[in-house]
Amino acid sequence: MRLSALKHLIEATQALCHPERIRVLGSSALLASFPELGEPGQPLEISFDADLLIEPCDPQLAAMLHEAVGEGSLFAQRTGYHADFLRPDILETLAAGWELAVVSFAGIANASALAPADVAAVKLRLGRPKDLQLCRHLIVGGLVAPEAIRARLDAMTLVESDIVRVFARLREVSN
């Protein structure tokens, strides 16, 4: 996904519901800091969705937005990309203080993206192969320092088994 596509999704969502705020979470949030990641040959080139948290949002609004710009919508069929709308409880899985480091989008009011170190921390927690590959790209490419990710992991609420697993993943992608 390119930054222009992400901005289009945000603007379409804003036009539909006029939210107080839109938060971009997930991999596409990286485009706010590193637009080049969506270019050909880059890790987000083949990403076709953006995880959006609309504030405020109720189940009826989420259903309406999904029909309008979600997976399988006419919008998605026409553009080739779509939005996935998240529940507010997703914020409980993020590191404490995440909202202090969000990245704004130039030219789009009331929209921000999760900071790169926070995205990487979430991806390491998930641990899917594609997530680990993305984290490795961020670290090896010098886009995010392992120490910054470690700090965000330290600020997450993790059970002991997750702590061991997540920090092992960080060591793995840092080498």
Language-model features, listed with the residues they occupy:
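Compositionally biased terminal segments of proteins
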Residues: 1-175
